[in-house]
Amino acid sequence: MNEQFIQFPQIDPIIFSIGPIALRWYGLMYLIGFGFAYWLGMRRAKNSNGVWTTEQVDQLIYTCFWGVILGGRIGDVFFYNFDRLLQDPMFLFRIWEGGMSFHGGLIGVIVAMIWVSFRQKRSFWNTADFIAPLIPFGLGMGRIGNFINDELWGRITDVPWAVLFPSGGYLPRHPSQLYEFFLEGVVLFFILNWFIKKPRPAGSVAGLFLIGYSVFRFLVEYVRDIDPNVNTVDDLITRGQLLSLPMIIGGLAIMIWAYSRKKA
């Protein structure tokens, strides 16, 4: 029966290793994502008529890099794997094993943006609107890393493109990581970069990002397998959806505020 479905490609999560040092696909995907964000940010700085300098973008990307890494890891552990942390405190530091929370990473990036805005004496919303269109590609690369790591797969299904994941018991499952790659990494990227082609009120780009990501994440959660270690609310809403709802509301509030200020 399972012959009709797609076999998970056997990809070694480690690309190569030299002694105790190993380069993993998961880490490489993040580096590619940040590399692309850096390149795109520099390109936008050169076309910003002096609003941004390449030095300022360099500082912003570097600071946000650490915000994502630290916030993403801490968020994953505290939001989704707190019980495991209590059993094995060193789990927090084994980032190479995978496990990065977008919501934790977002908190880390917000802290980084506040610090950079203060240092550069610019509006927080100016910083947020600049960084938002740089994020989706990196999100998509992270989902590719999840796919290669054979983690965060979807629920059991009989769709023709179902994948037989080894850690999922070789049962046909939704490749939910690839759904998120397409929606969060590709579709959202084009939406935001189309949106910024015209002048927009301060905060509107960041607001649209929050709405777009959260709606896509909320929808994919319906086919993403529920982590048995993470509670749901009466089996009606997942932890990921619960964390996404405030972001949808917040994004809408920011958009309304941004456009109401413009009219005023």
Curated annotation (Swiss-Prot):
GO biological process, one term: lipoprotein biosynthetic process
Pathway(s) the chain acts in: Protein modification; lipoprotein biosynthesis (diacylglyceryl transfer)
InterPro entries (alphabetical): Lgt
Subcellular location: Cell inner membrane
Recorded GO CC terms: plasma membrane
Membrane topology: Multi-pass membrane protein
Transmembrane segment boundaries: 14-34, 60-80, 98-118, 128-148, 176-196, 203-223, 240-260
The entry's keywords: Cell inner membrane, Cell membrane, Membrane, Transferase, Transmembrane, Transmembrane helix
Positions that bind a 1,2-diacyl-sn-glycero-3-phospho-(1'-sn-glycerol): 143
Enzyme type, top EC level: transferase
Disulfide bridge positions per record: none
Molecular-function GO terms, alphabetical: phosphatidylglycerol-prolipoprotein diacylglyceryl transferase activity
EC number: 2.5.1.145
NCBIfam families: lgt
Function of the protein: Catalyzes the transfer of the diacylglyceryl group from phosphatidylglycerol to the sulfhydryl group of the N-terminal cysteine of a prolipoprotein, the first step in the formation of mature lipoproteins.
Family under the similarity heading: Belongs to the Lgt family.
PANTHER family assigned: PHOSPHATIDYLGLYCEROL--PROLIPOPROTEIN DIACYLGLYCERYL TRANSFERASE (PTHR30589:SF0), PROLIPOPROTEIN DIACYLGLYCERYL TRANSFERASE (PTHR30589)
The protein's name in its UniProt record: Phosphatidylglycerol--prolipoprotein diacylglyceryl transferase
